[in-house]
């Protein structure tokens, strides 16, 4: 089954945006980044994505408290019959739907599709970093439980073959 996970961390330190975007967009020993997309930020490179999020906060004096949210969408977290190429193709489509979902809610996002080797199969997943403020109002995002539940509902409707777990996991 596919799964939507919200990382339940504070993300309040001043360099968390920089660290998290670098983390999701950098190859590691066991995982590789297949694609990076951004919505509502300058897409030129990692640094412009990071500075776009930070500047949006500075413009409205919202640089304290929770800075970002980190979501992971696992595309069949366990070994299954779907080929790695199919998972990657679905992941690329899902990235655009998620990015546009948050953009429709005036939320900046950076997403990365990754493939991580686990035993003899690939765990294809998407990391999503979203800003904690509304781009139009400058207010902190509230009612994130509803925001994430509606995202999950959209994914379940648009991608029924993924058999998404029907609940958001907070990890």
List each language-model region with its residue ranges:
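N-terminal nicking endonuclease/strand-transfer module with a His-rich metal-binding environment
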Residues: 1-171
């Amino acid at each position: 089954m596919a799964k939507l996970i919200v990382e339940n961390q504070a993300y309040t330190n001043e360099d968390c945006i920089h660290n998290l975007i670098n983390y999701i967009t950098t190859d590691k020993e066991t995982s590789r980044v297949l694609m990076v997309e951004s919505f509502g930020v300058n897409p030129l490179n990692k640094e412009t994505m990071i500075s776009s999020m930070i500047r949006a906060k500075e413009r409205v004096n919202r640089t304290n408290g929770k800075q970002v949210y980190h979501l992971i969408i696992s595309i069949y977290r366990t070994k299954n019959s779907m080929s790695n190429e199919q998972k990657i193709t679905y992941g690329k489509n899902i990235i655009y739907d998620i990015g546009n979902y948050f953009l429709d809610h005036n939320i900046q996002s950076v997403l990365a599709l990754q493939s991580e080797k686990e035993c003899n199969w690939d765990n294809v997943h998407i990391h999503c970093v979203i800003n904690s403020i509304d781009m139009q109002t400058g207010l902190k995002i509230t009612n994130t439980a509803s925001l994430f539940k509606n995202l999950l509902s959209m994914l379940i409707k648009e991608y029924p073959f993924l058999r998404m777990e029907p609940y958001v996991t907070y990890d």
